[in-house]
Curated annotation (Swiss-Prot):
SUPFAM superfamilies in alphabetical order: Glutathione synthetase ATP-binding domain-like (SSF56059), PreATP-grasp domain (SSF52440)
Underlying gene: ddl
Residue intervals of the ATP-grasp domain: 107-302
Any one GO MF annotation of this record: D-alanine-D-alanine ligase activity
Record keywords, A-Z: ATP-binding, Cell shape, Cell wall biogenesis/degradation, Cytoplasm, Ligase, Magnesium, Manganese, Metal-binding, Nucleotide-binding, Peptidoglycan synthesis
Name this protein carries in UniProt: D-alanine--D-alanine ligase
One Pfam assignment: Dala_Dala_lig_N
CC cofactor note: Binds 2 magnesium or manganese ions per subunit.
Family, per entry: Belongs to the D-alanine--D-alanine ligase family.
Protein backbone atom coordinates (compact mmCIF):
# COMPACT_ATOMS: atom_id res chain seq x y z
CA UNK A 1 0.00 0.00 0.00
CA UNK A 2 1.10 3.55 -0.65
CA UNK A 3 1.55 6.17 2.06
CA UNK A 4 -1.50 8.06 0.76
CA UNK A 5 -3.62 4.89 0.93
CA UNK A 6 -2.39 4.06 4.43
CA UNK A 7 -3.22 7.54 5.71
CA UNK A 8 -6.89 6.84 4.96
CA UNK A 9 -6.73 3.68 7.12
CA UNK A 10 -6.97 3.06 10.87
CA UNK A 11 -3.65 1.56 12.00
CA UNK A 12 -3.69 -0.65 15.09
CA UNK A 13 -0.29 -0.97 16.81
CA UNK A 14 -0.41 -4.34 18.55
CA UNK A 15 1.78 -4.39 21.65
CA UNK A 16 2.20 -5.87 25.13
CA UNK A 17 0.60 -9.28 24.85
CA UNK A 18 0.90 -12.38 26.99
CA UNK A 19 4.53 -13.48 26.64
CA UNK A 20 7.56 -13.19 28.90
CA UNK A 21 8.68 -10.31 26.65
CA UNK A 22 5.60 -8.18 27.38
CA UNK A 23 7.47 -5.21 28.87
CA UNK A 24 9.86 -4.99 25.92
CA UNK A 25 6.91 -5.14 23.53
CA UNK A 26 5.18 -2.26 25.30
CA UNK A 27 8.28 -0.12 24.71
CA UNK A 28 8.50 -1.18 21.05
CA UNK A 29 4.82 -0.49 20.53
CA UNK A 30 4.93 2.92 22.19
CA UNK A 31 7.85 3.98 19.98
CA UNK A 32 6.10 2.77 16.82
CA UNK A 33 2.82 4.42 17.82
CA UNK A 34 4.51 7.78 18.40
CA UNK A 35 6.35 7.53 15.07
CA UNK A 36 3.09 6.89 13.21
CA UNK A 37 1.33 9.79 14.94
CA UNK A 38 4.28 12.05 14.09
CA UNK A 39 3.86 11.11 10.42
CA UNK A 40 0.14 11.91 10.47
CA UNK A 41 -1.34 8.41 10.58
CA UNK A 42 -4.59 7.55 12.35
CA UNK A 43 -2.97 5.09 14.76
CA UNK A 44 -4.22 3.50 17.97
CA UNK A 45 -2.11 1.60 20.52
CA UNK A 46 -3.66 -1.74 21.48
CA UNK A 47 -2.44 -3.81 24.44
CA UNK A 48 -3.14 -7.33 23.24
CA UNK A 49 -5.12 -9.68 25.48
CA UNK A 50 -7.32 -12.69 24.80
CA UNK A 51 -10.15 -10.41 23.64
CA UNK A 52 -8.02 -9.01 20.81
CA UNK A 53 -10.47 -10.05 18.06
CA UNK A 54 -13.28 -8.03 19.65
CA UNK A 55 -10.95 -5.06 20.20
CA UNK A 56 -9.87 -5.04 16.54
CA UNK A 57 -13.53 -4.93 15.49
CA UNK A 58 -14.47 -2.30 18.08
CA UNK A 59 -11.55 -0.05 17.06
CA UNK A 60 -12.30 -0.45 13.33
CA UNK A 61 -8.68 -1.43 12.65
CA UNK A 62 -7.89 -1.62 8.92
CA UNK A 63 -4.15 -2.46 9.14
CA UNK A 64 -2.14 -3.98 12.00
CA UNK A 65 1.42 -2.99 12.85
CA UNK A 66 2.63 -5.91 14.98
CA UNK A 67 5.01 -4.77 17.73
CA UNK A 68 4.63 -7.94 19.79
CA UNK A 69 7.50 -10.17 20.91
CA UNK A 70 7.46 -13.81 21.97
CA UNK A 71 4.54 -16.20 22.20
CA UNK A 72 1.18 -15.39 20.64
CA UNK A 73 2.77 -12.46 18.81
CA UNK A 74 5.91 -13.68 17.09
CA UNK A 75 4.95 -17.34 16.62
CA UNK A 76 2.22 -17.13 13.98
CA UNK A 77 -0.73 -16.99 16.39
CA UNK A 78 -1.70 -13.33 15.92
CA UNK A 79 -0.80 -13.56 12.23
CA UNK A 80 -3.31 -16.39 11.80
CA UNK A 81 -6.03 -14.40 13.54
CA UNK A 82 -5.38 -11.38 11.32
CA UNK A 83 -5.47 -13.59 8.21
CA UNK A 84 -8.88 -14.95 9.25
CA UNK A 85 -10.17 -11.43 9.96
CA UNK A 86 -8.80 -10.11 6.67
CA UNK A 87 -6.66 -7.42 8.32
CA UNK A 88 -3.33 -6.78 6.52
CA UNK A 89 -0.37 -6.80 8.89
CA UNK A 90 3.34 -6.05 9.02
CA UNK A 91 6.14 -8.59 9.02
CA UNK A 92 6.20 -12.27 8.19
CA UNK A 93 3.28 -14.63 7.72
CA UNK A 94 2.00 -17.52 9.81
CA UNK A 95 4.42 -20.24 8.69
CA UNK A 96 7.59 -18.13 8.67
CA UNK A 97 6.74 -16.72 12.10
CA UNK A 98 6.10 -20.18 13.55
CA UNK A 99 9.30 -21.60 12.05
CA UNK A 100 11.46 -18.72 13.28
CA UNK A 101 10.02 -18.89 16.79
CA UNK A 102 10.74 -22.62 17.10
CA UNK A 103 14.53 -22.83 17.30
CA UNK A 104 14.50 -26.56 16.49
CA UNK A 105 12.50 -26.29 13.26
CA UNK A 106 14.43 -23.15 12.32
CA UNK A 107 17.74 -25.01 12.66
CA UNK A 108 16.45 -27.75 10.38
CA UNK A 109 15.46 -25.15 7.78
CA UNK A 110 18.86 -23.47 8.06
CA UNK A 111 20.64 -26.79 7.62
CA UNK A 112 18.52 -27.54 4.53
CA UNK A 113 19.64 -24.16 3.13
CA UNK A 114 23.29 -25.11 3.83
CA UNK A 115 23.73 -22.46 6.51
CA UNK A 116 26.11 -23.19 9.39
CA UNK A 117 24.56 -24.06 12.77
CA UNK A 118 26.21 -25.12 16.02
CA UNK A 119 26.00 -28.84 16.92
CA UNK A 120 22.89 -29.40 19.04
CA UNK A 121 20.62 -31.91 20.74
CA UNK A 122 16.94 -31.64 21.64
CA UNK A 123 15.49 -32.75 24.98
CA UNK A 124 11.79 -32.97 25.84
CA UNK A 125 10.21 -32.62 29.25
CA UNK A 126 10.33 -36.05 30.91
CA UNK A 127 13.56 -37.10 29.17
CA UNK A 128 16.45 -38.20 31.35
CA UNK A 129 18.79 -35.49 30.15
CA UNK A 130 22.48 -36.15 30.70
CA UNK A 131 25.64 -34.59 29.33
CA UNK A 132 26.83 -38.08 28.39
CA UNK A 133 24.19 -38.11 25.63
CA UNK A 134 25.78 -35.15 23.86
CA UNK A 135 28.15 -35.65 20.94
CA UNK A 136 30.01 -32.47 21.88
CA UNK A 137 31.74 -31.29 25.02
CA UNK A 138 31.35 -28.48 27.55
CA UNK A 139 30.73 -25.60 27.54
CA UNK A 140 27.19 -25.75 26.17
CA UNK A 141 24.27 -23.35 25.85
CA UNK A 142 20.88 -24.45 27.18
CA UNK A 143 17.82 -22.62 25.85
CA UNK A 144 14.04 -23.07 25.56
CA UNK A 145 12.89 -23.85 22.03
CA UNK A 146 10.36 -21.01 21.80
CA UNK A 147 11.41 -17.98 23.83
CA UNK A 148 13.21 -14.84 22.75
CA UNK A 149 15.30 -12.09 24.38
CA UNK A 150 17.53 -14.80 25.92
CA UNK A 151 14.75 -15.73 28.37
CA UNK A 152 15.63 -19.01 30.12
CA UNK A 153 19.08 -19.26 28.47
CA UNK A 154 22.13 -20.49 30.42
CA UNK A 155 25.77 -21.20 29.61
CA UNK A 156 26.93 -24.43 31.26
CA UNK A 157 30.66 -24.75 31.88
CA UNK A 158 30.65 -27.48 34.53
CA UNK A 159 28.69 -30.73 34.72
CA UNK A 160 27.30 -29.67 38.11
CA UNK A 161 25.52 -26.71 36.44
CA UNK A 162 23.66 -28.76 33.82
CA UNK A 163 20.63 -29.89 35.86
CA UNK A 164 19.86 -26.38 37.11
CA UNK A 165 20.16 -24.95 33.59
CA UNK A 166 17.77 -27.57 32.23
CA UNK A 167 15.29 -26.91 35.04
CA UNK A 168 15.38 -23.18 34.31
CA UNK A 169 14.83 -23.71 30.57
CA UNK A 170 11.96 -26.16 31.18
CA UNK A 171 10.16 -23.39 33.09
CA UNK A 172 9.48 -21.82 29.70
CA UNK A 173 9.05 -24.70 27.28
CA UNK A 174 8.47 -28.44 26.84
CA UNK A 175 11.38 -28.72 24.40
CA UNK A 176 14.93 -27.64 25.18
CA UNK A 177 17.85 -27.07 22.85
CA UNK A 178 21.37 -27.83 24.07
CA UNK A 179 24.00 -26.37 21.75
CA UNK A 180 27.75 -26.49 21.57
CA UNK A 181 29.09 -23.16 22.87
CA UNK A 182 30.77 -21.29 20.01
CA UNK A 183 33.38 -18.68 20.84
CA UNK A 184 32.97 -15.75 18.49
CA UNK A 185 31.72 -12.22 17.95
CA UNK A 186 28.00 -11.46 18.26
CA UNK A 187 27.02 -10.04 14.87
CA UNK A 188 23.48 -9.15 13.88
CA UNK A 189 22.22 -8.39 10.38
CA UNK A 190 19.29 -6.07 9.78
CA UNK A 191 16.93 -6.97 6.93
CA UNK A 192 14.51 -4.46 5.40
CA UNK A 193 12.38 -5.09 2.31
CA UNK A 194 14.10 -8.51 2.15
CA UNK A 195 17.59 -6.97 1.70
CA UNK A 196 20.44 -6.71 4.19
CA UNK A 197 20.92 -3.16 5.50
CA UNK A 198 24.13 -3.82 7.40
CA UNK A 199 25.68 -5.76 10.27
CA UNK A 200 26.28 -4.59 13.83
CA UNK A 201 28.67 -6.13 16.37
CA UNK A 202 27.64 -6.53 20.01
CA UNK A 203 30.20 -6.58 22.82
CA UNK A 204 28.31 -7.37 26.06
CA UNK A 205 29.66 -6.36 29.46
CA UNK A 206 28.51 -9.72 30.83
CA UNK A 207 29.65 -13.12 29.63
CA UNK A 208 26.97 -13.31 26.96
CA UNK A 209 24.29 -11.15 25.41
CA UNK A 210 21.56 -11.82 27.98
CA UNK A 211 18.27 -10.06 28.74
CA UNK A 212 19.94 -7.33 30.83
CA UNK A 213 22.55 -6.65 28.15
CA UNK A 214 19.81 -6.31 25.54
CA UNK A 215 17.55 -3.94 27.43
CA UNK A 216 19.66 -2.09 30.04
CA UNK A 217 21.63 1.00 28.98
CA UNK A 218 25.40 0.59 29.17
CA UNK A 219 25.35 -3.21 29.38
CA UNK A 220 26.62 -3.76 25.83
CA UNK A 221 28.73 -1.88 23.31
CA UNK A 222 27.31 -1.61 19.79
CA UNK A 223 29.83 -1.32 16.95
CA UNK A 224 28.45 -0.33 13.54
CA UNK A 225 29.53 -1.55 11.09
CA UNK A 226 30.74 -4.82 12.61
CA UNK A 227 34.54 -5.12 12.77
CA UNK A 228 34.95 -7.76 10.09
CA UNK A 229 37.21 -7.97 7.03
CA UNK A 230 35.39 -6.76 3.92
CA UNK A 231 34.83 -10.20 2.39
CA UNK A 232 33.64 -11.69 5.68
CA UNK A 233 31.31 -8.71 6.17
CA UNK A 234 29.76 -9.38 2.76
CA UNK A 235 29.53 -13.08 3.63
CA UNK A 236 27.54 -12.44 6.80
CA UNK A 237 25.18 -10.07 4.94
CA UNK A 238 24.54 -12.78 2.32
CA UNK A 239 24.00 -15.36 5.07
CA UNK A 240 21.49 -13.03 6.71
CA UNK A 241 19.49 -12.73 3.50
CA UNK A 242 19.73 -16.51 2.96
CA UNK A 243 18.41 -17.21 6.48
CA UNK A 244 15.55 -14.73 6.00
CA UNK A 245 14.59 -16.50 2.76
CA UNK A 246 15.09 -20.01 4.19
CA UNK A 247 12.23 -19.44 6.62
CA UNK A 248 10.07 -17.63 4.07
CA UNK A 249 10.18 -14.33 5.97
CA UNK A 250 8.56 -11.18 4.59
CA UNK A 251 9.58 -7.54 4.78
CA UNK A 252 11.95 -7.20 7.67
CA UNK A 253 13.81 -9.20 10.30
CA UNK A 254 17.02 -9.33 12.31
CA UNK A 255 19.35 -12.29 11.89
CA UNK A 256 21.76 -13.16 14.71
CA UNK A 257 25.16 -14.79 14.17
CA UNK A 258 28.29 -15.82 15.99
CA UNK A 259 31.31 -15.14 13.77
CA UNK A 260 34.53 -16.96 14.68
CA UNK A 261 38.12 -15.82 14.18
CA UNK A 262 38.38 -18.44 11.43
CA UNK A 263 35.55 -16.74 9.51
CA UNK A 264 32.75 -19.23 10.17
CA UNK A 265 29.28 -17.64 10.46
CA UNK A 266 27.12 -19.67 12.86
CA UNK A 267 23.49 -18.63 12.64
CA UNK A 268 21.70 -18.38 15.98
CA UNK A 269 18.20 -17.28 15.01
CA UNK A 270 15.99 -15.06 12.90
CA UNK A 271 13.86 -12.52 14.75
CA UNK A 272 10.79 -11.85 12.63
CA UNK A 273 9.60 -9.02 14.90
CA UNK A 274 12.82 -7.40 16.12
CA UNK A 275 12.75 -4.85 18.91
CA UNK A 276 11.87 -1.24 18.11
CA UNK A 277 13.00 0.36 21.39
CA UNK A 278 15.65 3.03 21.95
CA UNK A 279 18.26 0.30 22.48
CA UNK A 280 17.06 -1.97 19.67
CA UNK A 281 19.45 -3.04 16.96
CA UNK A 282 17.39 -2.91 13.77
CA UNK A 283 16.68 0.83 14.18
CA UNK A 284 20.37 1.40 14.92
CA UNK A 285 21.43 -0.53 11.81
CA UNK A 286 18.86 1.43 9.79
CA UNK A 287 20.25 4.74 11.08
CA UNK A 288 23.67 3.63 9.93
CA UNK A 289 22.18 3.27 6.44
CA UNK A 290 20.62 6.72 6.56
CA UNK A 291 17.11 5.57 7.51
CA UNK A 292 15.64 7.40 10.51
CA UNK A 293 13.24 5.71 12.93
CA UNK A 294 10.08 7.27 11.51
CA UNK A 295 11.17 6.36 7.98
CA UNK A 296 11.88 2.79 9.11
CA UNK A 297 8.43 2.47 10.70
CA UNK A 298 6.76 3.90 7.59
CA UNK A 299 8.61 1.52 5.25
CA UNK A 300 7.69 -1.47 7.40
CA UNK A 301 4.06 -0.34 7.42
CA UNK A 302 4.02 0.14 3.63
CA UNK A 303 4.72 -3.58 3.20
CA UNK A 304 1.72 -4.64 5.33
CA UNK A 305 -0.28 -7.35 3.60
CA UNK A 306 -2.20 -10.58 3.94
CA UNK A 307 0.20 -13.44 3.20
CA UNK A 308 -2.20 -16.32 2.52
CA UNK A 309 -3.40 -16.31 -1.10
CA UNK A 310 -7.12 -15.91 -1.52
Amino acid sequence: MTVDELKTKKIGVLMGGLSAEREVSLKSGAAVHQALLARGYDAVAIDVDRDIAQVLVREWVDVAFIALHGRYGEDGAIQGLLEIMGIPYTGSGVLASALAMNKIFAKQAFQAARLTVAPYKVFCRGDKAALAELEFSLPVVVKPSQEGSSVGVSIVKKESEFAAAMKEAFRYDREILVEQFIKGSEVQVGILEDKALGAIEIVPKNEFYDFDAKYSPGMAEHILPARLPAELYRKVLRAGEDAHRALGCSGYSRVDFLVTEEGACYILEVNTLPGMTDLSLLPEIARGSGIGFEDLVERILAAAALKISQ
